[in-house]
Amino acid sequence: MSNILTKILARKVEEIAERLLHVSQAELVARCADLPTPRGFAAALQATIVHGDPAVIAEIKKASPSKGVLREDFRPAEIAISYELGGASCLSVLTDVHFFKGHDNYLSQARDACTLPVLRKDFTIDPYQVYEARVLGADCILLIVAALDDAQLVDLSGLALQLGMDVLVEVHDIDELERAIQISAPLIGINNRNLSTFNVSLETTLTMKGLVPRDRLLVSESGILTSADVQRLRAAGVNAFLVGEAFMRAAEPGESLREMFFIT
């Protein structure tokens, strides 16, 4: 496990303990009973692909540990609207406070501003966070294989699916992929960023693509910065993408999305 991931997870344990002092898990469970049905995250991606278009999960991210602040003028609702107009199929919203300058409210603001399904992009390690994601309005959660043991993967993915959410399971290498396909989550995200070196290579997706079962939807994540990157992955049969940094640095994120994915 990388040094930065170890630090993030240690902080996440502290954060969950702090949140439990204010809102109990039982209270979150009770709130989940009265919520509207989630928007279909995996279904939205599949529908776009069936139509013949690339399925884009557009990320709303203020900052990252490696790059610092990506966007000073950060307005989640406006960014969400821009992404929807630009052709995104789904959104991903960073809610981690300490390392990514995210906030739970960013997810709610983005989701309320558009009709797209939303992924809560955070470091989920405990059932408390799954219930919390559902209460916030998330339609999908992220599970990072490098951060979890097999029992956690089974339990957390099962709980999310039981609550009506989809699950994006993120892997970085073949060993993690073999673990990911043992659970029934519909989405497999291949992160092109090496967690140890933070180097990025699209070869990670291209090398591992053939090992993803046909009944799972592969999502390529990180390092997709240009239309040439998109064309390279599309030519190899990759149809779903998670992109954040390239859009966050653009004056108009949705227009940047449209230019990268839909103008040839």
Curated annotation (Swiss-Prot):
Catalytic activity entry: 1-(2-carboxyphenylamino)-1-deoxy-D-ribulose 5-phosphate + H(+) = (1S,2R)-1-C-(indol-3-yl)glycerol 3-phosphate + CO2 + H2O
Pathway where this protein functions: Amino-acid biosynthesis; L-tryptophan biosynthesis; L-tryptophan from chorismate: step 4/5
InterPro entries: Aldolase_TIM (IPR013785), Indole-3-glycerol_P_synth (IPR045186), Indole-3-glycerol_P_synth_dom (IPR013798), Indole-3-GlycerolPSynthase_CS (IPR001468), RibuloseP-bd_barrel (IPR011060)
Record-listed E.C. numbers: 4.1.1.48
Pfam families referenced in this protein's UniProt entry, alphabetically: IGPS (PF00218)
Catalytic class of the enzyme: lyase
Source organism superkingdom: Bacteria
Example GO biological process: L-tryptophan biosynthetic process
Any one GO molecular function term: phosphoribosylanthranilate isomerase activity
SS bond partners: none
Keywords: Amino-acid biosynthesis, Aromatic amino acid biosynthesis, Decarboxylase, Lyase, Tryptophan biosynthesis
Family as reported in the entry's similarity comment: Belongs to the TrpC family.
Annotated PANTHER family: INDOLE-3-GLYCEROL-PHOSPHATE SYNTHASE, TRYPTOPHAN BIOSYNTHESIS PROTEIN
The protein's name: Indole-3-glycerol phosphate synthase
Species per Swiss-Prot/TrEMBL record: Xylella fastidiosa (strain M12)
Gene this protein is translated from: trpC
